[in-house]
């Protein structure tokens, strides 16, 4: 949208200048500018500050400028940071914001939403909410109770609270960042004052999140200057360096792990293919715990890449931009390694309109056609888009403005570092299906099954998941529900308990299609049963019986014993498909608690909520 005098508070000359400037800015420059403007207004009455050129200013230096500009102002010096996180991204970013504010002398309360005492909410002077959206617009597990409280009649008026929201999501889902949007709207309804605009982050969230953190930090520094601003800025820089120094290899700088093994876990005759990958971490300094995940940067299907290039009659050797600092690669390499081409999103189609001569595409992206848009993008890819909406004026140099970056795929770790030093194991099921007259392939799963050989290098990083962890006390009993590849983290759990000599009972419920061909890690479970590492194993193979049977039926059949384990302090873990399996498993748990605990439906729900708040009911679902 172009700024005009009629749709903005700017003069025609100002609007013209802004319209010329904004398209030329890099993401880094935009983030710098948003943070600078956040504190500029509050610092106007303070002593003038010499501002270096944008390209030469870091986020830490920006905060130092904010502190200097606000030296004449004093305000609250406490901040509450609440996060709701399923895989750990929101929690990591919340910790980063907390470190920055502590470095500037603020008193910081950092808490998962389900651990926060809600009677403290109305006392919060500054409130920062960092939350992801899970599934079909749902809050993460550790945000649900706080979300429900805030949207209930029990929520207090927050007239004295200033807030901002960072929302994480994925534009390939219909309800992109809905949970963050809900928090933003509800806090406003309760009277809280928004001090920085909500930022909605896609899967490539690092830059947008850094910009938001810089903006809210700048606002706080402008409103509540430290006693010694320059010193505080040095502390912030040291704090940031400490955070960044935790690991050389990160999401932004992945480790090239050598593939040691790539095995098919399914037996001959199976209609499924599940790969067991063993990767070397030697020399990386990376470590992980049971429950963590590995982020894998895959390659797109070379055949699909070549089809796209051929359709547009591009030169595969053309140089295109692939990095924020202007790094380039050949067009073919960019489509193989850097850009997403298998998923269509609403933002992608909206951007594509400018390069298409199709009136149908322009009509499809109109707000009133959202149902048709949702139906179209499901199961289609960039090649479909190109074929369906000709003609195109898209040039190879336009890629960075239209396609989003190829996001990493997260896989639950299937090994214990104590059991396999300098290694990490993954369990990946091959995804292939037919849709819209063409065969579709999962980007990472097909890469792993068809094109990845021992000796190859795979770019990876460790994704900590603090919301899915075995009990601190290894003698605590555990109940693990993991059908299919959902069993992966429980191999890590049990290997670790074996290494620690855990005395606690362990119960695994596993399911798949056929016993003979689809019993993943069968020999591991049998050995662990024989050695006493695994106390009880119940299985459900849905295609081996006339009537399909699933893990939730096995739970109900053993309901009395399962409830007894719960009463003895057992922790329950569920991993796998959220839409069907996890929902059915939770329903089975509620039935068991109600029937064998003598509780009403409301009482059973309260019991399960209490387990969740105690960290005794954890889910890693997708």
Each PLM stretch: what is its role?
Residues 1-622:
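FNR-like FAD-binding dehydrogenase module
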């Amino acid at each position: 949208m172009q700024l005009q005098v009629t749709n903005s508070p700017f003069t025609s000359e100002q609007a013209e200048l802004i319209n010329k400037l904004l398209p030329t800015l890099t993401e880094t420059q935009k983030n710098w500018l948003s943070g600078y403007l956040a504190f500029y207004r509050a610092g106007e009455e303070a002593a003038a500050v010499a501002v270096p050129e944008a390209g030469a200013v870091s986020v830490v230096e920006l905060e130092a400028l904010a502190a200097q500009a606000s030296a004449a102002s004093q305000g609250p010096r406490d901040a509450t940071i609440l996060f709701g996180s399923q895989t750990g991204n929101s929690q990591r970013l919340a910790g980063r914001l907390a470190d920055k504010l502590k470095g500037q002398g603020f008193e910081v309360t950092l808490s998962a939403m389900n651990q926060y005492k809600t009677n403290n909410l109305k006392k919060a002077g500054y409130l920062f909410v960092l939350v992801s959206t899970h599934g079909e617009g749902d809050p993460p597990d550790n945000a649900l109770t706080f979300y429900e409280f805030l949207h209930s009649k029990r929520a207090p008026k927050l007239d004295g609270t200033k807030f901002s929201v960072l929302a994480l999501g994925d534009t390939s889902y219909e309800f992109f960042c809905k949970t963050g949007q809900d928090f933003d709207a509800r806090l406003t309804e309760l009277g809280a004052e928004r001090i920085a605009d909500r930022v909605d982050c896609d899967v490539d969230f690092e830059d947008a999140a850094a910009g938001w953190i810089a903006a809210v930090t700048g606002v706080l520094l402008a409103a509540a200057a430290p006693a010694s601003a320059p010193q505080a800025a040095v502390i912030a820089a040291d704090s940031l360096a400490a955070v960044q120094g935790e690991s050389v290899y990160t999401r932004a700088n992945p480790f090239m792990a050598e593939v040691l093994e790539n095995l098919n876990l399914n037996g001959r005759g199976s209609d499924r293919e599940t790969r067991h990958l063993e990767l070397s971490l030697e020399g990386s300094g990376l470590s992980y715990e049971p429950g963590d995940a590995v982020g894998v940067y895959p390659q797109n299907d070379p055949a699909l890449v070549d089809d796209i290039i051929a359709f547009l009659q591009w030169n595969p050797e053309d140089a295109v931009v692939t990095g924020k600092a202007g790094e380039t690669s050949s067009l073919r390499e960019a489509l193989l390694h850097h850009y997403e081409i298998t998923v269509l999103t609403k933002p992608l189609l909206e951007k594509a309109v400018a390069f298409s001569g199709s009136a149908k595409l322009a009509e499809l992206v109109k707000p009133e056609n959202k149902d048709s848009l949702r139906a179209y993008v499901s199961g289609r890819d960039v090649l479909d888009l190109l074929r369906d909406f000709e003609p195109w004026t898209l040039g190879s140099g336009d890629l960075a403005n239209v396609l989003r970056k190829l996001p990493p795929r997260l896989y639950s770790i299937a090994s214990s570092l104590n059991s396999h030093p300098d290694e990490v194991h993954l369990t990946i099921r091959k995804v292939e299906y037919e849709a819209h007259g063409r065969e579709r392939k999962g980007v990472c799963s097909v890469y792993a099954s068809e094109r990845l050989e021992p000796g190859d290098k795979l770019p990876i990083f460790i994704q900590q998941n603090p919301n899915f962890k075995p009990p601190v006390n290894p003698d605590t009993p555990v109940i693990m529900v993991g059908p299919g590849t959902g069993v992966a983290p429980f191999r890590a759990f049990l290997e670790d308990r074996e290494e620690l000599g855990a005395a606690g009972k362990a119960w695994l419920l596993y399911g798949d299609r056929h016993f003979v061909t689809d019993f993943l890690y069968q020999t591991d479970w049998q050995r662990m049963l024989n050695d006493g590492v695994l106390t009880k194993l119940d299985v459900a193979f849905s295609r081996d019986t006339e009537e399909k049977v699933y893990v939730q039926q096995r739970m109900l059949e053993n309901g009395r014993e399962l409830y007894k384990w719960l009463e003895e302090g057992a922790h329950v873990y569920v991993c796998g498909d959220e839409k069907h399996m996890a929902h059915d498993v939770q329903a089975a748990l509620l039935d068991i608690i109600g029937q064998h605990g003598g509780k009403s439906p409301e009482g059973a729900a309260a019991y399960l909520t209490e387990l969740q708040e105690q960290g005794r009911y954890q889910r890693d679902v997708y």
